[in-house]
Design a protein with these regions (language model features):
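Class I SAM-dependent methyltransferase SAM/SAH-binding core
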Residues: 7-60
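Conserved class I S-adenosyl-L-methionine
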Residues: 98-123
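Hydrophobic beta-strand segment of the Class I
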Residues: 70-71
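A short His-aromatic
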Residues: 74-79
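A short glycine-rich, Lys/Arg-flanked "PGG" loop and its adjoining helix->strand segment in the class I
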Residues: 83-98
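C-terminal lobe and adjacent flexible extensions of AdoMet/dcAdoMet transferase-like proteins
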Residues: 158-196
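Class I SAM-dependent methyltransferase Rossmann-like catalytic core
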Residues: 1-6
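Short alpha-helix
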Residues: 119-143
């Protein structure tokens, strides 16, 4: 991925089981996987640089602006409260931090699935999640479909990836109007007055 070299910092947060299974070759010092229920697959990933924590995904146990990158790989599709997960991700993400969100594409053949295994599945269009991100002051850097099994990525690809960066300042500024003092000789009232 061309965005990986741009990611700097010390900690990456992977929220959800699918996020934890994504391998990233980042130079981060520490990767933290947050999950509501620990599974043997995720336990096998733990080492000196990877921690596994069982928590509620809607109340992250971190202080504000501590994490530099957040991965949400299909986490929002299985969440009961995706807005709260995004708000918590925004809270713990450092200024100019990155967020990677993968979603099941509602235009793919998965549209007819309502469950995956024991988990209820909800489809969110990418434009809706991008709107949620803009309300949290994220700048969407890229949105791209991801194909599977050597297929060409199209609008009907099963997964859509959204890459966004947290911005410190609002994206739309409303500057106050600055009125400069107009020189006397340019004022319409004084244009035809003679100097004495």
């Amino acid at each position: 991925m061309p965005w990986m070299p741009k990611i700097l910092g010390h900690q990456v947060l992977k929220i959800g089981g699918l996020s934890g299974e994504v391998t990233t070759n980042l130079p981060m010092h520490h990767q933290i996987i947050l999950i509501e229920k620990i599974t043997p697959n995720l336990t096998a990933l733990c080492n000196a640089k990877v921690s596994l924590v069982q928590v509620s995904l809607t109340e992250l146990p971190f202080i504000q602006k501590e994490i530099h990158t957040v991965f949400l790989m299909n986490t929002l599709n299985f969440a009961q409260d995706p807005h709260q997960i995004l708000r918590e991700s925004h809270r713990v993400l450092a200024d100019d931090g990155w967020i990677f969100i993968a979603l099941f594409n509602p235009l793919s053949p998965l549209i007819f699935k309502r469950k995956m295994g024991d988990y209820p599945l909800r489809h969110y269009p990418a434009w809706r999640v991008m709107d949620w991100l803009s309300l949290l002051n994220f700048e969407v850097i890229e949105k791209c479909p991801i194909a599977t099994k050597n297929k060409l990525a199209t609008i009907f690809s099963p997964i859509t990836l959204i890459i966004a960066q947290k911005r410190t300042y609002p994206l739309t500024l409303n500057p106050e109007k600055v009125r400069s003092k107009i020189p006397v000789f340019l004022e319409p009232v004084n244009a035809f007055k003679l100097k004495s």
